[in-house]
Amino acid sequence: MTEPETLALLDMKDTEISEKSPPQASVLQPEEEGGTESPGAESLRVGSSVGSPTVREGPEDGPDSTISEAATLPWGTDPHPSAPLPDPPGWRDIGPELLESEAPIKSEEPLKEDANLLPEKTVRAFVPIDLQCIERKPQEERIKHREAGPGELRNFLPARLSHPEPPERKWAEAVVRPPGRSCGGCGSCGGREALRAVASVVAALIFFPCLLYGAYAFLPFDAPRLPTMSSRLVYTLRCGVFATFPIVLGLLVYGLSLLCFSALRPFGEPRREVEIHRQYVAQSVQLFILYFFNLAVLSTYLPQDTLKLLPLLTGLFAISRLIYWLTFAVGRSFRGFGYGLTFLPLLAMLVWNLYYMFVVEPERMLSASESRLDYPDHVRSVSDYRPRSWG
């Protein structure tokens, strides 16, 4: 076989090999373009020029023998740096139709920033991390809290730091602060509330003696003749029955509030609508005991002409407790006026009783003898006593 025929045969075999194995051709192609030739290529060229027996046996064995011999050539195992990556196994089984169908369709729309450009298998190897779930450091939270304006402070406050207030504090603040008003935390609201409370007590201090004197002078009734101490005590106790009216009314409202707001559990969460009436009833009972204890002692020292004060003080107690209940329910600081109308008469009676016990009649402090105020030299006799026309 002549040399031209051998070269033609080699060219035919090269074309068949390139058709059956395109990856090998692509691998060899960059090497030829780069100017570097592998040792296998040199041996192939030398054999073709000299007419080696390996090439001569090619036509007898067929193209398969040529591929096997090419596989046994002493090529380097390391891939060339400029060579592309080898294709995965099984690529020959994929038909051209599937490759065309799986080809990515270029969309005219620009890619989004959050679009996933990685293959599906690669995405599975990564675990997504939500930056919002990472706990921030307390220093960063403080910085943001300081930099935020007064209207934005509530937005940067994390939910996990908001500690719920106890229910007792909630309804107590709701009672002191009227609903619908917001406090900016400047501290002036507390001073105003205290000033209003003091002003209401001072108003009660001025209004209490004027009201008592006007009722004593202008109301058309007189107290009955009560010469003995026992009769005065009985009269005082009978007047005290009328003073229990606001307390009993408070108990009824308290029971209805328990039913309406389903607060029947004794150790459950207290509600503002229920606690208002409960505190009013408890405070009224305490003041009633102190008030009428001093009123009973006062009845033993008053002269006959001034016994009219007993029913007047009883009515003042009932009216003042109703005023306090109303102002306490609406959450006004002016409730000190109603409390002052109850506490100031109690304080005045206590001072009067101590004065008579230690100054006027110290010998009768612990005795049950008749008072000097009922003797002829202190009061009028029974014959001189003339009740008023309306008494």
UniProtKB/Swiss-Prot annotation:
It is found in: Lysosome; Golgi apparatus, trans-Golgi network; Membrane. Residues 1-200, 262-279, 331-339 are cytoplasmic. GO terms for molecular function: identical protein binding. It is a multi-pass membrane protein. Residues 1-96 are annotated as: Disordered. One of its GO terms (biological process) is hair follicle morphogenesis. Keywords: Golgi apparatus, Lysosome, Membrane, Transmembrane, Transmembrane helix. GO terms for cellular component: cytoplasm; lysosomal membrane; trans-Golgi network membrane. Residues 222-240, 301-309, 361-391 are extracellular. It comes from the Eukaryota. The chain crosses the membrane at residues 201-221, 241-261, 280-300, 310-330, 340-360. PANTHER family: TRANSMEMBRANE PROTEIN 79. Contributes to the epidermal integrity and skin barrier function. Plays a role in the lamellar granule (LG) secretory system and in the stratum corneum (SC) epithelial cell formation. This is Transmembrane protein 79. It comes from Rattus norvegicus (Rat).
